[in-house]
Amino acid sequence: APVEFERADAVVEPFAEPVMCPQPQSQASGQNEGKDDYLGSEDCLYLDIYAPGGQKESERWPVMVWVHGGSNLTGHKGTYDFARLAARQQVVVVVINYRLGPLGWFSHPALNGPQLDAPALANFGTLDIIEALRWTQRNITGFGGDADNVTLFGESAGGRNVFSLLASPM
């Protein structure tokens, strides 16, 4: 299960290339060479924040959190450039990665641990999305966002993941 990022005072330098969670090569990953190779890294649970400039001290912008699609097997937060959306609509846009495929939705009794409430909990991808939302709630004001005005949206499997959170007790 994801753990809270504790280094609130640390500056995390942005990556030049988007980090993808492990996935097969595909059109969604932007890497389709007809190979059976996997791309990405398990060190992939990052988010990007796009904020418009020119904010007044007391002003807070609405926040949009985007969940990428890709059948929960492929895709990543770097699929689209949300800088224009943030600037034109005066919103803060948060884009997230979450674990995919068997790393995101694999169930096995050996996965049980003292921190898990349910036996063989398998929805690690969903838990990654929930933790990203929790992080956003705790930290978005530092980027000019309004923590009381957050909209979660997604495309394809990302939209289905958003919908699944409506049924989640978390």
Which sequence ranges carry the predicted segments?
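Short glycine-enriched nucleophile-adjacent loop
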Residues: 159-170
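Short beta-strand immediately N-terminal to the catalytic nucleophile in serine-hydrolase-like folds
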Residues: 152-155
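Acidic helix/loop microenvironments that form the catalytic cleft of cell-wall polysaccharide enzymes
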Residues: 69, 157-158
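Non-catalytic accessory segments of hydrolases
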Residues: 1-126, 147
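Hydrophobic pocket-lining residues that define ligand/cofactor binding sites across diverse proteins
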Residues: 140
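Short, hydrophobic alpha-helix immediately C-terminal to the catalytic nucleophile
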Residues: 130-133, 163-164
